[in-house]
Amino acid sequence: PTTRPAPTIRPVPGERAFMHTPVMVREILALLAIRPDGTYVDGTVGGGGHARAILERLGPRGFLLALDRDTNAIAMAREALAAWSAQCCFEQGNFADLKPLAERHGLQAVDGVLLDLGMSSLQVDQAERGFSFMQDGPLDMRMDLKQATTAAHLVASLGEEALAEII
């Protein structure tokens, strides 16, 4: 496969860094029923909006494992949630690998898992990521920028039937 370098997303000088405004935060927190000493996983941390809401409700013995496939999202969330660094660990990875990622942090059980599925505005707003429907950009569409295969490679190398199955 053609390997493209991973784009690095940085705020434009003078602009605020990306901050995720979570949707349905009250409903999500009610469903998670956050306990101050609980252990939680945000499997799609993105910009950290939902994670912040969880961390604000945790006590000193509470813990959050924050995961994301997107290395840029992990870096931004780590910065946005630095005040909770004693209670929050970050891992670049796929939530499908939750068990080994959790075990790496000594977690055998958790009290709740949040998965906010889909693209984030972090990806859509950056034309170079290839997800934008408002700006021209390369046909990339990788959630995990460490992956070599881009959407352009798939379109060029797969047949119509295989592409239809993906879509």
Residue spans for each PLM region:
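S-adenosyl-L-methionine-dependent methyltransferase catalytic core, i.e., the SAM/SAH-binding region
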Residues: 1-4, 9-167
